[in-house]
Each structure stands twice: as structure tokens, then as C-alpha cells.
């Protein structure tokens, strides 16, 4: 048994312009090779594009998109007696948000388009409306969990 104390849970910091934790989580996920200023640039340009497209507050569009993509349940591979089962597990809010952000960024990277800011803004607007690749990913995850409900007792 470890003698070390339990690690303190870190509180998410908020970004300098919007003073929002979700924006900061998005910046930290989009970050590549430690170029945080570039990540901030991409996010803020995407927010401006959302403002121009929808003529509403880009933060509310971001919140709506993340809320729409956040999964309630996921599947986890569990080895039981020589065979691997996909066991459905419930997801907490923080982990769900992290998954949603990862899916949104993955879907926007796959999109055809000029630059990342344009692709991200399009994906966020689509997700807020209830369409797009990230929403499809969430629905697919929920379908997988529903199909493997029989293995829920393996938790």
C-alpha cells in the first residue's frame, strides 16, 4: 500500500478574454508542441467566426455544442474468462466534457476547409444545431452501450 497522500484535484483555470473554463479546456486540448499562443489564436478566431455566422454569443454556442456532444454513458473493454466484453459504464461530468471536447476537435480536424479556426467554428455551430461528426460519435457510443447492456453487471 502506498504511503503517499492523495493528490489534490486541480481546478481548471479560465482563459484571459472570455474568463471561461471551457475555453481554457479547449485551448489545452488543441495545443500542439507547446504552442499555446497559437492555440489561443485559433480558438479566438473560431469564436469570432461563430459570432459572425450566428450573430449570438459564441460562448453560448460553445456551451450548447459541448452539452450536445457530452455522452452520458460509454463502453469499456473488460476481460472476463478469456473473452473481452464491452461493458457500459456511466461517465462523470468532467470526463464527459473532456470526451466531448476531444470529439469536437477530432471532427473539426477531419473536416475539409481552409484553416483550423474555420473548421472548428463550423463544427461547433453544427454541434450546437444537433448535427455533425461529433454528435454522430456520441450517438454511436450510446448505441454501443445500449447493445452491450447485457454485460452491465461486469462492472
From Swiss-Prot:
Major localization listed first in the record, in broad terms: plastid
Keyword annotations of the record: Chloroplast, Plastid, Ribonucleoprotein, Ribosomal protein, RNA-binding, rRNA-binding
Gene Ontology CC terms: chloroplast; small ribosomal subunit
InterPro entries xrefs: Ribosomal_uS7, Ribosomal_uS7_bac/org-type, Ribosomal_uS7_CS, Ribosomal_uS7_dom, Ribosomal_uS7_dom_sf
Highest taxon above the source species: Eukaryota
MF terms in GO: rRNA binding; structural constituent of ribosome
Name of the protein described by the UniProt record: Small ribosomal subunit protein uS7cz/uS7cy
